Amino acid sequence: MGRVRTKTVKRAARQIVEKYYGKLGLDFQYNKKVAEEVALIPSKRMRNKVAGFITHLMRRIQKGPVRGISLKLQEEERERRMDYIPEKSELEVPVIQVDQDTADMLNFLKISLPNLKVMSFNAHEHREDTK
């Protein structure tokens, strides 16, 4: 069974990963040396725990975004995804078909849509494409 990591170890490892992401890798020994260089860790045992959690976080980061860690690379990727504009809008449809009740509601609310077409639908009629 695994051991529970303390809040101190997790917090220290997250801060080191955020600041020195470019220097770190998936190798525990290398991460241990980097942690020793960049942080004042009081004991050897604590340094090893921090380095172990850094290695664990680096593996998780490679799989995808990790909660609680803000990396410049991930921020840029998120910004790029949010700023994406599709070539063809899904909202631009040639004709919007509505029944008479819906058309009356839109008129009451003073909403005018350019491609609106009022259709008469039978309540008992079942459309083929709704299956």
UniProtKB/Swiss-Prot annotation:
Keywords: Ribonucleoprotein, Ribosomal protein
A biological process term (GO) from this entry: translation
Domain of life: Eukaryota
GO cellular component assignments: cytosol; ribonucleoprotein complex; ribosome
Gene3D superfamilies: Ribosomal protein S17e-like (1.10.60.20)
Entry keyword Ribonucleoprotein: yes
Record flagged with keyword Lipoprotein: no
MF term (GO), any: structural constituent of ribosome
Database matches in PANTHER family: 40S RIBOSOMAL PROTEIN S17
The family this protein is said to belong to: Belongs to the eukaryotic ribosomal protein eS17 family.
HAMAP family: Ribosomal_eS17 (MF_00511)
Protein name: Small ribosomal subunit protein eS17
Lineage of the organism: Eukaryota, Sar, Alveolata, Apicomplexa, Aconoidasida
Gene: RPS17
